[in-house]
């Protein structure tokens, strides 16, 4: 079984990832050296724990977002997806097929001048009945 990570390790790892995401990798030894360069970590075991958690989070970040970590690249990607507008609307149709009852209801609601309305015969299947 693994060990429980302290609040200090988790917070330090998240801050390091947010600031130095582009320099970090999925390799523990590389991340250990980067943590040593960018942060003042008092003890060697604490540095190794932070580097291990950074490596763990980098693996999770590769697949999806991690709660509590905001990376500019992911923010920009999310912003682009949210603001995407297709060239042709999926809701726009040239012909809308309606039956007689629906057309009458639209006429009563003053929607009788909608373009593309086409009257169709309702499909009456006698399911389960034999001739």
Curated annotation (Swiss-Prot):
Q: Known SUPFAM superfamilies for this protein?
A: Rps17e-like
Name the GO cellular-component terms: cytosolic ribosome; cytosolic small ribosomal subunit
List UniProt keywords, sorted A-Z: Ribonucleoprotein, Ribosomal protein
What is the originating organism of this protein? Drosophila melanogaster
**Similarity-based family:** Belongs to the eukaryotic ribosomal protein eS17 family.
Identify this protein by name.
Small ribosomal subunit protein eS17
Q: Which Pfam families match?
A: Ribosomal_S17e
A biological process (GO) of this protein is:
cytoplasmic translation
Superkingdom: Eukaryota
PROSITE patterns in alphabetical order: RIBOSOMAL_S17E
A GO MF term = structural constituent of ribosome
């Amino acid at each position: 079984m693994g060990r429980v990570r302290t609040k200090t390790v988790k917070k330090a790892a998240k801050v390091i990832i947010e600031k130095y995401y582009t320099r970090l990798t999925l390799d523990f030894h590389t991340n250990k050296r980067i943590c040593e360069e960018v942060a003042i970590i008092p003890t060697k075991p604490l540095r190794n724990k932070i580097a291990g958690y950074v490596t763990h989070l980098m693996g999770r970040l590769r697949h999806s977002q991690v709660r509590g970590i905001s990376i500019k690249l992911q923010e920009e990607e999310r912003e682009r997806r949210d603001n995407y507008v297709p060239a042709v609307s999926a809701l726009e149709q040239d012909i809308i097929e309606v039956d007689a009852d629906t057309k009458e209801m639209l006429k009563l609601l003053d929607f009788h001048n909608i373009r593309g309305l086409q009257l169709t015969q309702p499909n009456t299947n006698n399911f389960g009945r034999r001739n």
